[in-house]
């Protein structure tokens, strides 16, 4: 698809965050496809393995990486816990924690989106935020014109262990294929993710 080809051509030659940020405007990607910074403001903090271990020592997190009983926690913690509970997201926190404390090599097969989000929260270079739209755009790019593969990736809506290889390929691409000048910027993968999120979302709606 031409829009995907143009997107990756621009990403591969970008040397600054500003150049990456201009791509969506240059390609005239509609605002409705773009990540809303008011809904998803940039996370400027990181969470380390050591911080998770400290929470375990304090009894906030169990040895199984689940949230413990927080009845005696501070009001903010209880409020955020309540939001996760109401949305049915308590088990998702386990996957995020596992992503934060894991090493580079792993065999994780479920909860991949939240697991990778945990890796992103460590703010280690080349650890992106993964979602269906980003992988859709990258998958179409990797299909290299193969219509059958393109059609399959355009329909991608749920990320399972079948997409683990594609996730690994995307992470390798982020760490090795982009210009060194771009990779020298802190949190560069976040800005690349935003571009691919919008492009992937646009080709899904148009498919």
Where are these regions (language model features)?
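C-terminal accessory module of base-excision DNA glycosylases/AP lyases that mediates lesion recognition
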Residues: 1-45, 128-207
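Long, highly charged, low-complexity intrinsically disordered interaction regions
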Residues: 1-103
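Short, hydrophobic/amphipathic alpha-helical patches that form generic packing surfaces
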Residues: 50-57, 68, 72-88, 116-121, ...
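Intrinsic-disorder/low-complexity, polar/charged segments
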Residues: 65-75, 89, 113, 145, ...
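Helix-hairpin-helix
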Residues: 97-124
